[in-house]
Amino acid sequence: MEALVYTFLLVGTLGIIFFSIFFRDPPRMIK
């Protein structure tokens, strides 16, 4: 159960970093 919590926190942190970079510098591959 503890591993699930740690993985959730890790994914959440990586997700926040990814979205912050994504919205700060929008990729040009979409258009």
UniProtKB/Swiss-Prot annotation:
InterPro entries: PSII_PsbT, PSII_PsbT_sf. GO terms for biological process: photosynthesis. Pfam families: PsbT. It is a single-pass membrane protein. Keywords: Chloroplast, Membrane, Photosynthesis, Photosystem II, Plastid, Thylakoid, Transmembrane, Transmembrane helix. The chain crosses the membrane at residues 3-23. The keyword 4Fe-4S does not apply. Signal peptide: none annotated. Its main location: plastid. The keyword Transferase does not apply. It comes from the Eukaryota. GO terms for cellular component: chloroplast thylakoid membrane; photosystem II reaction center. It is found in: Plastid, Chloroplast thylakoid membrane. Found at the monomer-monomer interface of the photosystem II (PS II) dimer, plays a role in assembly and dimerization of PSII. PSII is a light-driven water plastoquinone oxidoreductase, using light energy to abstract electrons from H(2)O, generating a proton gradient subsequently used for ATP formation. Belongs to the PsbT family. PSII is composed of 1 copy each of membrane proteins PsbA, PsbB, PsbC, PsbD, PsbE, PsbF, PsbH, PsbI, PsbJ, PsbK, PsbL, PsbM, PsbT, PsbY, PsbZ, Psb30/Ycf12, at least 3 peripheral proteins of the oxygen-evolving complex and a large number of cofactors. It forms dimeric complexes. This is Photosystem II reaction center protein T. It comes from Chlamydomonas reinhardtii (Chlamydomonas smithii).
